[in-house]
């Protein structure tokens, strides 16, 4: 069996220095390199895995709309050697396990099936792998200095949070902290709801474990284990860490946050888990979902590949369902410094659950899910100086909005008393640590969306997205963009001040979110 690659699907980047638990991140635009497998085509690599006799895989089968189709397709699943794990009849997606190597091909020939495909190239269950890195832990000296600098009304670590004033969240909090009737769901690696910065605002009823593609509602199933990444806990804190005299403050510290665990222990975000997560959010009153990941094993899912097309079809159905139910879906743009509007991108990481096979893809035809899906708010990252982060993906017509996600202090140094260009947030075990990535930018926008929902409780998801865009602070292109000062252009921005490929409509504005009625 081919060994698993270290999963890189979370939208964080690894740091050279790290402490504490598992997963914080650096400023290297491309982290994966080509392998000896580049003599094969990508499709050949995938089929080489699935054609092994009796390989157990997970699949999604997408049913065509039409009376009676669901029942017929379910019967066909059994005849094709599949076992139904979960049927999401509300969106026509069926999660299946099968050891029949021809299962997907057989199902694609069944009347009433729109698409069907394997959600992974690795056999069930996925092998365990180590995480990418560790958070850069907050030191005792930093905490003491921050606490001494805190003014009345601030949480003790808030002076280190340069990201809050960058979106005017500190000013917004003088008006309101957000509504307890608003919930943001974090689809991620799990959330430690016992953390003192998260416990006051945690919504247990809207939390679940979706890793298998079927909701696990056992108490605490949404939490990460000790071996798993703190990523989801950090993201949740950026959104809604309570303003309670402890630790940090979230963008919307008065709203609720839930944990929807969609990542395996090995760190993979598979389609069945993501579909389950969106459907759960849709049916449990969630107002905003945050998605700081890409769906494994393909960084880009190509429409001309029947398996990859099926994965996109399933996630589109689920995310649109969540939006129809009132949720605004926010997603991280990614950390490869890719131009997502380019004619071609060289993908060296896919499939990431077996042996990657380098390939050239057209990002207009091969989609990063959920980042590039219709209706999703796609977020680019900025650093402490308000410039595009060195790692952040970009692209005219792809990026919707920008927010702080951090960057190396060598590139963008914050003003004192903040000392790190990264984003500070909670990590499991009652600790706090620094992380960076578009993973950190996305929850800032999710938090602002939650503040807008708090101000406009009857607003539809579409209306909230419209306000998010109209209230953003426009930022012109950074031209030339030479973030490391070596005299070479590191990325090219297209567009004008009011919209461009680096910052979209601009940087999210939390103060406008709570003060503007239109």
Locations of the language-model features?
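N-terminal domain-start motif of subtilase-like serine proteases
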Residues: 40-51, 78, 130-186, 214-228, ...
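Substrate-binding/access-modulating region of protease and related hydrolase catalytic domains
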Residues: 262-369, 373, 426-444, 500
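Extracellular S/T/G-rich loop segment that most often corresponds to the catalytic His/Ser-adjacent loop
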Residues: 353-451, 508-515
């Amino acid at each position: 069996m081919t060994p698993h690659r270290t999963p890189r699907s979370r939208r964080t980047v690894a740091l050279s220095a790290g402490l504490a638990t598992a997963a914080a991140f650096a400023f290297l635009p491309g982290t994966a390199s080509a392998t000896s497998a580049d003599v094969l085509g990508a499709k050949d690599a995938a089929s080489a895995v699935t054609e092994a006799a009796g390989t157990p895989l997970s699949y999604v089968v997408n049913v065509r709309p039409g009376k009676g189709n669901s029942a017929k397709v379910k019967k066909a699943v059994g005849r094709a050697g599949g076992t139904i794990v979960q049927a999401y009849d509300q969106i026509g997606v069926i999660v299946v396990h099968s050891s029949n190597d021809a299962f997907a091909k057989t199902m694609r020939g069944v009347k009433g099936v729109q698409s069907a495909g394997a959600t992974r190239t690795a056999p069930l269950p996925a092998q365990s792998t180590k995480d990418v890195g560790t958070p850069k832990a907050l030191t005792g000296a930093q905490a003491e200095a921050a606490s001494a600098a805190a003014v009345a009304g601030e949480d003790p670590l808030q002076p280190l949070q340069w990201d809050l004033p960058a979106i005017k969240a500190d000013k917004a909090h003088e008006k309101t902290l957000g509504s307890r009737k608003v919930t943001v769901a974090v689809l991620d690696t799990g959330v430690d709801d016992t953390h003192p910065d998260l416990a006051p605002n945690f919504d247990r009823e809207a939390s679940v474990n979706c890793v298998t593609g079927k909701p696990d509602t056992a108490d605490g199933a949404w939490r990460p284990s000790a071996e798993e990444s703190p990523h989801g806990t950090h993201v949740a804190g950026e959104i809604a860490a309570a303003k309670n005299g402890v630790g940090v403050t979230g963008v919307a510290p008065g709203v609720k946050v839930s944990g929807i665990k969609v990542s395996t222990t090995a760190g993979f975000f598979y389609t069945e888990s993501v579909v389950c997560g969106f459907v759960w959010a849709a049916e449990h009153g969630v107002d905003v979902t945050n998605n700081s990941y890409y769906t494994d094993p393909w960084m880009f899912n190509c429409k001309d590949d029947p398996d990859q097309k099926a994965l996109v079809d399933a996630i589109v159905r689920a995310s649109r369902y969540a939006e129809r139910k009132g949720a605004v879906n926010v997603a991280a743009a990614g950390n490869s410094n890719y131009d997502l509007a380019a004619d071609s991108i060289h993908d060296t990481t896919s499939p990431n659950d077996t042996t990657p096979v380098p390939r050239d893809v057209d990002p207009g035809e091969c989609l990063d899910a959920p980042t590039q899906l219709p209706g999703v708010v796609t977020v680019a990252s900025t650093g402490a100086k308000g410039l595009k982060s060195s790692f952040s993906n970009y692209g005219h017509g792809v990026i919707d909005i920008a927010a702080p996600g951090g960057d190396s202090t060598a590139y963008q140094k914050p003003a004192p008393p903040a000392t790190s260009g990264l984003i500070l947030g909670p990590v499991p075990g009652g600790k706090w640590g620094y992380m960076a990535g578009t993973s950190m930018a996305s929850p800032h926008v999710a938090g602002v969306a939650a503040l807008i929902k708090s101000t406009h409780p009857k607003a539809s998801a579409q209306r909230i997205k419209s306000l998010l865009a109209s209230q953003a602070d426009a930022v012109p292109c950074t031209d030339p963009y030479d973030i490391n000062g070596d005299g070479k252009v590191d990325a090219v921005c297209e567009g004008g001040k009011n919209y461009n490929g680096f910052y979209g409509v601009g940087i999210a504005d939390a103060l406008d979110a709570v003060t503007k009625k239109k």
